[in-house]
C-alpha cells in the first residue's frame, strides 16, 4: 500500500535521483544498503521486476517520524524533466562539481521518485500547527540511492543538484 493511501502519513515533498537505466540497481541491494545506512529504517513492500531490479519500496524512519515511497520511472516523462533541468540549470551559476553533474544529466534516462511523508501524529491540527519536517532521513536516502545507481539527486523545489 502506498503511503498516499495511509492516513497515518501526510505527503510533504518529492525529490528525484536521475541515472542511466543501465545502472539501475537490484532491489535486494537497495534494501540492504538502506538498512545499512540506518539500522532504524524499516524497508518494506520491496517490488522488483523480472530481472530483480528495483521497481518500488516503502521506507519508514520512526526516529524522524517520516517515511518515503520510492518508485522507478523511465520514458518520456524522465526525458522531458531532464531537458527542463538542463535548460534551467545551464543558465544558473554552478560550482565545478555541479557542472560535472549537469553534464552527466544528459545521459540520464531513468529516475527514482522519492515521495517524502511526515507522520500525521497530531489530532485536529492543521499544517501550520506542525513543526518543520527534518529532511535528514530524506537526504541520507537520496545520497544512498545516488551512489547505488551512480546518479544525481535533484531537489525540484530549489532546482539544486545533490
Each predicted region: which residue ranges?
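Short glycine/proline-enriched loop/turn "hinge" motifs that connect secondary-structure elements
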Residues: 6-7, 101-109
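Well-ordered, non-membrane alpha-helical segments in soluble/globular domains
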Residues: 26-27, 88-95, 132-139
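Short, extreme N-terminal segment that most often corresponds to the first beta-strand
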Residues: 1-45
